[in-house]
Amino acid sequence: MKWLKRLTVIVGTFYRYRLAGLCASLMGSGWICALLKMMPQSSKLKNEPPAVRLRLALESLGPIFIKFGQVLSTRPDLIPHDYAVELAKLQDKVPPFDARLSREQIEKSLGQSIEKLYAEFETEPIASASIAQVHKARLHSGEQVAVKVLRPNLLPVIEQDLSLMRFGAGWVERLFADGKRLKPREVVAEFDKYLHDELDLMREAANASQLGRNFQNSDMLIVPKVFYDYCTSDVLTIEWMDGTPVSDIAKLKADGIDLHKLADYGVEIFFTQVFRDGFFHADMHPGNILVAADNRYIALDFGIVGTLTDYDKRYLAINFLAFFNRDYRRVATAHIESGWVPADTRAEELEAAVRAVCEPVFNKPISQISFGLVLMRLFEVSRRFNVEIQPQLVLLQKTLLNIEGLGRQLDPDLDLWKTAKPFLVKWMNGQVGPKALWRNLKNEAPDWAQIIPSLPRKISALIDENRQQEMRDAYIHLVKVQQRQSLWLAVIAVVLLLILLLK
């Protein structure tokens, strides 16, 4: 009955942080809404805004609910702006777990003692979070490494909270007036995937390797090497990186780092990942970024990445170019063409809504305009028009806000549009014209080479199938005609019989 005990804790938290009223307001009306309003409320925190109380409640419920709040903060298409801003303040910081447990977990996962695995292993962790903690070590071959190890016995705790979230999401969808639009079950399912992805450190290792290949020999970004012989789903061993935290501006200046160049690098790295690679680091907050002595960024923590299809890239390029040209009609038609907008949406209404939220953003010098804010405004419009926002674009918006904030912290005069526009124009130009046609033909050639030899047979089979379908349809039609005829004959026979009997 552990789940019942946990449910009691959650309900008690709702009381303590006065959230029953918030639930009632979301429900709209009805007897359950009235019942919630009648529930006793704690006298504490009564002067705090609802968004603040929700953040404090999630913090008190522990790491899994904190992470859930962080995920919600990236969904301005689902929750109001003030809630998104407040939930973004949630911090995933917990005390480290016992070093003995850490050693046991590593030895169990890698099948050898710590002494055989590492020449040196620092017992005191250098970083700790709700999912894992990190130790510094040295391999017998001499390389300095960082060893990330999952918290022991974490999965049962996560599954218990997730099952309660799924249970709650089902009731939210049934009872709340806004339940279906909020898509609570989809949000919890997305969070479930996000959490389980973070729990698989082999996936993180693969993400690091992919990003490393994409930026091999780059003069802008360093990605640590992965030591796969010392990795499992529970343990990750990567190259140790020395650098200055990107948030330590004073030290960066003292070290002679070119902050203007560094800010430009950040924007260029981001748009290179998006439009060249379609694969981007989606957790680029200052805590995951160091700066090397040679003015390059060092990326850390590869648990969350995003991938983009050519369709996603086209959506982004069209929308950004249209936004900065104030072509709101094109923004509206791009959304309708994407198929993410309900079929009955009128382009004129969507255009007017986009103009209303974006004109205030663009009524300032272009160098001061926030790309992330533009996307956020777009997501706010999406809430009103029931636009289906793709998870990868939400991740992208969150990452873009981080990159912008970081860039302007390094260089307040950073002009993102100046750096981004060449990427957008180059990518759009690359999608049309003879070169693009030739590239697409080359990419599709292997598929056509397989299809063409079997094409006559497939066409013949299709014709036969159509002919057989026509014969089946004709047979069914004939049977129906005969059934109708039989029915009429039966009716006539009954009528004649009745006439004879009445005589």
Swiss-Prot record:
Lipid bilayer topology: Multi-pass membrane protein
One Gene Ontology term from the biological process aspect of the record: ubiquinone biosynthetic process
Record bears the keyword rRNA processing: no
Domain Protein kinase: 120-491
GO cellular component: plasma membrane
Family per similarity comment: Belongs to the ABC1 family. UbiB subfamily.
Protein name: Probable protein kinase UbiB
Species assigned in the record: Neisseria meningitidis serogroup B (strain ATCC BAA-335 / MC58)
Underlying gene: ubiB
